[in-house]
Amino acid sequence: DKPFEEGGIEARPLARGKYILVGASLCGGRAYAVLEKFFRTFVVQAGGEDKALYEVLKKLARAAMNQENPVEVSTLFNGTRTDPTLRDSITNISENNFTPEGITYGVLHGMIKELYDMYQQIHQGTGIQVSHLVASGNGMRKNKVLQEISSEMFGADLSLAVYQEEAACGAAVSSAMAF
């Protein structure tokens, strides 16, 4: 059988003739780093200290979590695997939500929405449904708001991967399965 592949969803081989369906964004967590750089540049230009603002961003995002009519951010800074010319956009801006809090929450929501849209392609093509999320990466590990957005959007409980070096661990497990 040929595994499902469509619209940027790839079937990557596992051991024993199995496949894993992968929807991989080109920007992912880097979108949050771009946002942090934006705010940091502003702070420095305004005479503030040049230091990481991730803790501040977490507070801003938390403050906007239940905002009515939130800012919508598409985090396609580098396009997609199928169309690298696509770019980011910010929509649904009003005078009430065009705030640092609203933009920060919008970026986090947009990061997960890109992944959710990929999941929807897989679901529509295969019938596979999410029953539980296992998340990896420092962006997810260090940001409870991002975890909550993920769980809410996918409608499933979320756990963090047990090991922090996820790629190396996955390669080791895959190699061990081949024997």
Regions found by a protein language model. Give the residues of each.
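N-terminally biased helix-coil "hinge/interface" segments that flank
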Residues: 5, 123-124, 179
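FAD cofactor-binding and catalytic pocket of flavoenzymes
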Residues: 47-72
